[in-house]
UniProtKB/Swiss-Prot annotation:
<keyword id="KW-0067">ATP-binding</keyword>
<dbReference type="InterPro" id="IPR003593">
    <property type="entry name" value="AAA+_ATPase"/>
</dbReference>
<protein>
    <recommendedName>
        <fullName>Protein RecA</fullName>
    </recommendedName>
</protein>
<dbReference type="InterPro" id="IPR020587">
    <property type="entry name" value="RecA_monomer-monomer_interface"/>
</dbReference>
<dbReference type="GO" id="GO:0003684">
    <property type="term" value="F:damaged DNA binding"/>
</dbReference>
<dbReference type="InterPro" id="IPR049261">
    <property type="entry name" value="RecA-like_C"/>
</dbReference>
<dbReference type="GO" id="GO:0005524">
    <property type="term" value="F:ATP binding"/>
</dbReference>
<keyword id="KW-0238">DNA-binding</keyword>
<dbReference type="GO" id="GO:0006310">
    <property type="term" value="P:DNA recombination"/>
</dbReference>
<keyword id="KW-0742">SOS response</keyword>
<dbReference type="GO" id="GO:0016887">
    <property type="term" value="F:ATP hydrolysis activity"/>
</dbReference>
<keyword id="KW-0963">Cytoplasm</keyword>
<dbReference type="GO" id="GO:0140664">
    <property type="term" value="F:ATP-dependent DNA damage sensor activity"/>
</dbReference>
<dbReference type="GO" id="GO:0009432">
    <property type="term" value="P:SOS response"/>
</dbReference>
<keyword id="KW-0233">DNA recombination</keyword>
<dbReference type="InterPro" id="IPR020588">
    <property type="entry name" value="RecA_ATP-bd"/>
</dbReference>
<keyword id="KW-0547">Nucleotide-binding</keyword>
Length: 337
């Protein structure tokens, strides 16, 4: 068979596939117009930087996991607030039945426009996620948490019954269905997950996450969230510092980390972020115990600097704008290298 005949047959086959399944069902990669990944902010500049693309990607699956009370739900709620600020619609699948409306409100969420579901079983929760992703109207769905997605077989059985692998099979099947419509409809799904320890592991990391390997495979981004120290005010504990590590990233360089401060009842401290990033980028200069801005000492100690940024909106926004400009410059320089 000649080369001309081969090309002609291939052209006919491609035309037939497009006619049968639509123009976007098959194409030559070079003919596909380059599309920048659409993102929305996580609500934290430090996390946006660590993700490498400026925020969470649209149309993807994201897993946020870590020990209890490490800040996983707080990070997810901040993401919901950011989506709502852009005029988007978000849903919260509360499998743990533990959402605090007042805390969500404190983080900037419009609770009157947040879709909430508290499902009775894992199947029901994932069916709801699947249905919502197909509407094309939902921008973000948060599932809290994978560990609480109990299969019907386990719920209907007795306490002594062991249903091995039921949750992993449930997750794998659901993710196969959900993934197909996510990218097409631009819906992002954040799965919050817990940590378990494997029994009998002597060498290597004994930690694992519930739900089997399916979520690890289908997630475009996986964030490992850990508390590193407490934040105190006098004798009172007011929050904790959290380290977020990007352990998987299909869209940028993985293994970057972000440090944030989560304050009880308030969420991620924006003033702490501005203070940290401002110093890292040379906008704020430490001179002994003092911090200087534009050559002038403005605060003595990190605590006073954070208080100043909290109370001085003009200064906060001025430094924030400079941080954003500096980050854009750094990104452009890295792209030209």
């Amino acid at each position: 068979m000649t080369e001309i005949n081969e090309k002609s047959l291939l052209k006919q086959a491609l035309a037939e596939i497009k006619k049968k399944f639509g123009n976007e069902s098959i194409m030559v990669l070079g003919e596909k117009p380059p599309i920048d990944t659409e993102v929305f902010s996580s609500g934290s500049m430090a996390i946006d930087m660590a993700l490498g693309i400026g925020g969470f990607p649209k149309g993807r699956i994201i897993e946020i996991y870590g020990p209890e009370s490490s800040g996983k739900t707080t990070i997810s709620l901040h993401a919901i607030a950011e989506v709502q600020k852009q005029g988007g619609i978000a849903a919260f699948i509360d499998a743990e039945h533990s959402i605090d409306p007042q805390y969500a409100k404190n983080l900037g969420i419009d609770i009157d426009n947040l879709i909430l579901s508290q499902p009775d079983s894992g199947e029901q929760a994932l069916d709801i996620v699947d249905t919502l992703t197909k509407t094309k109207a939902i921008d973000l769905i948060v599932v809290d948490s994978v560990a609480a997605l109990v299969p019907m077989a386990e719920l209907q059985g007795e306490m002594k019954d062991q249903v091995i692998g039921a949750q992993a099979r449930l997750m794998s099947k659901a993710l196969r269905k959900i993934t197909a419509s996510l990218n097409k409809n631009g819906t992002t799904v954040i799965f919050i997950n817990q940590i378990r320890e494997k029994v009998g592991v002597i060498f290597g990391n004994p930690e694992t996450t519930p739900g089997g390997r399916g979520l690890k495979f289908y997630a475009s981004i996986r964030l490992d969230v850990r508390k590193i120290q407490q934040i105190t005010s006098g004798n009172d504990i007011t929050g904790h510092s959290v380290k977020i590590k990007v352990v998987k990233n299909k869209l940028a360089i993985p293994f970057k980390t972000a440090l944030v401060e989560i304050v009880f009842a308030k969420g991620i401290s924006k003033s702490a972020e501005i203070a940290q990033l401002g110093e890292e980028l040379g906008i704020l200069v430490r001179k002994g115990s003092w911090f200087a801005y534009k050559g002038e000492n403005i605060a003595q100690g990190k605590v006073n600097l954070k208080l100043l940024l909290e109370n001085n909106t003009k200064l906060f926004n001025e430094i924030k704008d400079q941080i954003i400009e500096k980050l854009k410059e750094n990104q452009q320089q890295s792209q030209t290298l």
